[in-house]
Amino acid sequence: MSTINTALQYSYDDLTIMPAVRSTVNSRKDVNPFKHSEKTNNEVLPIFTAPMSSVVDLYNLDMWYNNHITPIIPRNFDYKIRIEYLKKGYWCAFGLSELEDIYNSFDKFDNTYYILLDIANGHLSNLLQLCAKMKAKYKDSVKLMAGNIANPETLTMYDACGIDYVRVGIGGGSVCITSSNTGCHVPQGSLIHACYEYKTSAHLDIKIIADGGIRNYDDVIKALALGADYVMVGGIFGGFFESAGEIINDYKQYGSILYIDYVDGTITFGLKYSVPEISQDDNLLQYKVVDTKNISEITEYKDVPLHILSEEVKRYLIKEYTNMHKGIYGMASKKAQSELKVKAGQTAEGIEKLIPCKYTMKQWSKNMEDCLRSAMTYCNAQNLNDFIGKQTLVVNSLGEQIAVNS
């Protein structure tokens, strides 16, 4: 017989964080919002990129680390390429059959391999069985991340299999339609809190990653306050100037159209001038871009490598061309299924959409760091161990929600 849980369940929007009675932290500069990265031996924010091909590619991979965010190479890259980067110490996503191939192909790992088993339904028995085999064979030389789950009791099985990180959340992503397609979803705020309570009461070692429903800095902070060890972000990151998605623009002014193209790590951008007396053949159009050294000068360029663009130029372009968008799509969308060569007939549970290109990677990361520092100061938390899962959150009344969001 089916049951109904009548307890109210809350999303991030329903909750806010109550400050500490008294804070002895006198300045944001006095708190540490970072974790240690084994890959770079540097500090990182408690944030992973979603393994989305419209977010991460091989060209922006180290840019994420340089901005204190841990990237995960998505499954659209060739298996051999992912194995190559896996050996270099990068997080890489694999499907079930691919992980089985790794298990059958490697007697041992020369160093620590960071593997995300990237499937939609993290409650499958064969996922648990394969992860248990991997950890039994490779021990601590493999770090496993798996999911997604939306039932706190599943944590016990994950921990028993030796899985190191669990992605928590089903149907909450900005380009995910699992909830509307299947009806399977638990509001993310309550789910993260329930998983944290279950983890602490059972004394489990597994790390919780809040995955889905992140729309702003405060959502990241609330997820941590509720007990997530890390937060996974996809849609927001897809809107970064440096993200892997296509740059699309319909900006028109004074007879010119902003032309931006990004292919294989190279960006071509500038004003594509229409000349009435000349044929509109692309070969006869003049491409101009803002000079990378002086944004007040206009210089002819083409095929400008993304990594040489200064932060000043990137911010100038975002500010100047307000109709700039990035194309993003979920890894369960038709487009991603095509990239992954999924067999025809499988129902898509993701969508494609355009989102405004509003930030550079550095802008967002610095803003996120500052916001997290401020929240930790309000909550008298010197470090993330003091902050994660140790806060009091309050449920907003309907009237307050309307006031806050208006």
Annotate each language-model stretch with its function:
Residues 1-207, 235-240, 293:
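Active-site entrance/lid segments in N-terminal catalytic domains of soluble metabolic enzymes
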Residues 1-23, 183-210, 214-406:
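Alpha/beta catalytic cores of nucleotide-metabolism and tRNA/nucleoside-modifying enzymes
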